[in-house]
């Protein structure tokens, strides 16, 4: 994947302002609420019976932070995303059996969360760079499935 200097700047510039705990929790909660079938991968998280329960669930919050923290590894390794996510791809494929389509869904939700949090800064150019990034990350996570 080739990244222009502008794309790298748009991604890293915005990432430096992201509250990983809050945005990660919101992104995962939105995934579980908007796409309820994804809840089956989180049966150990306890009460996911309603949007209120999901939004208030500390395990959702903690895992959302973990997910977005690992997404930060992509931002730090833009030129080596495939290898950065090799182990996570293996885990999600071989042990967790997560449908790789869910990675794309989460990426799309992350875009929505970023747009909501950074409305003015999240220009069309910024969105284009981030859409590219979430596609590349989703592809890297789905790599072991092929």
Swiss-Prot record:
Globin domain: residues covered: 2-146
GO cellular component, one term: haptoglobin-hemoglobin complex
Species name: Anser anser anser
Protein name: Hemoglobin subunit beta
Keywords: Heme, Iron, Metal-binding, Oxygen transport, Transport
PANTHER family in alphabetical order: HEMOGLOBIN FAMILY MEMBER, HEMOGLOBIN SUBUNIT EPSILON
Quaternary structure and partners: Heterotetramer of two alpha chains and two beta chains.
Pfam families in the record: Globin
BP GO terms, sorted: hydrogen peroxide catabolic process
Gene Ontology molecular function: haptoglobin binding; heme binding; metal ion binding; organic acid binding; oxygen binding; oxygen carrier activity; peroxidase activity
Function description: Involved in oxygen transport from the lung to the various peripheral tissues.
Keyword Transport in record: yes
């Amino acid at each position: 994947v080739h990244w222009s200097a502008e794309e790298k700047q748009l991604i890293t510039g915005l990432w430096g302002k992201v509250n990983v705990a809050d945005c990660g929790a919101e992104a995962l909660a939105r995934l579980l609420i908007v796409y309820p079938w994804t809840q089956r991968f989180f049966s150990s998280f306890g009460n996911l019976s309603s949007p209120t329960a999901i939004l208030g669930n500390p395990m959702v919050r903690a895992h959302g932070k973990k997910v977005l923290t690992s997404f930060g590894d992509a931002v730090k390794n833009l030129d080596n995303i495939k290898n950065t996510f090799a182990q996570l791809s293996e885990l999600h494929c071989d042990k967790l059996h997560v449908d790789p389509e869910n990675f794309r869904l989460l990426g799309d939700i992350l875009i929505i969360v970023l747009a909501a949090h950074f409305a003015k800064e999240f220009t069309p150019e910024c969105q284009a760079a981030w859409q590219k990034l979430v596609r590349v990350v989703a592809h890297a996570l789905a790599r072991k499935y092929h």
